């Protein structure tokens, strides 16, 4: 799994350069996933022809709450982007972030939207407030281990066909409760996230084996 995060607006040269890198990495059979924002159908086809397997495009929150966290585009635009990518044959990785001020109803609504999308992978992130950012002072008192477990269990129940993944926040909200976490999810992330450090590969493997589980590594 190789992930490349990029901006929402691309020039043809940028897509061509990315396609070239994808072709190179596919030489050893690596399963590739890119987190790349919005694409036109033509751009997506260029990446598909280069061998890209999966694209990450999170819903992030519910349809009703989305405008509270993003002003540059709409929730429906994200849904339509995902549908276009599915139509072209891409696997989809799509999930959300918990702890941005949304209600419990918003969490349920987001998961119901994801059930309609049926992504191959569904990552759940738990907010890690970063000072100086718009959510730097977010109230995360509700993000107890019990509540976070309920969210993951609900994802498992509502979207059973997806690979349920625990991403950002697992080292904080599940510290000492890793066995419970691993009993619910299919996979966890290691070695950090887009805006925060995380548990390294060796420590993550130790966490998994100490909890009595075996592991497979999806990485490049």
Model-derived features: positions:
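Single conserved hydrophobic/aromatic residue that forms the stacking wall/gate
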Residues: 1-10
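Active-site beta-loop-alpha junctions enriched in small/polar residues
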Residues: 7-8, 35-41, 60-62, 95-101, ...
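Alpha-helix-loop-beta-strand connector modules within alpha/beta enzyme cores
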Residues: 12-36, 75-93, 139-161
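Structural preference for beta-strand elements that scaffold enzyme active sites
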Residues: 31-33, 54-56, 91-93, 121, ...
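Catalytic cores of alpha/beta
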Residues: 40-47, 101-113, 172-183
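Auxiliary Fe-S-binding modules of radical SAM enzymes
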Residues: 115-220
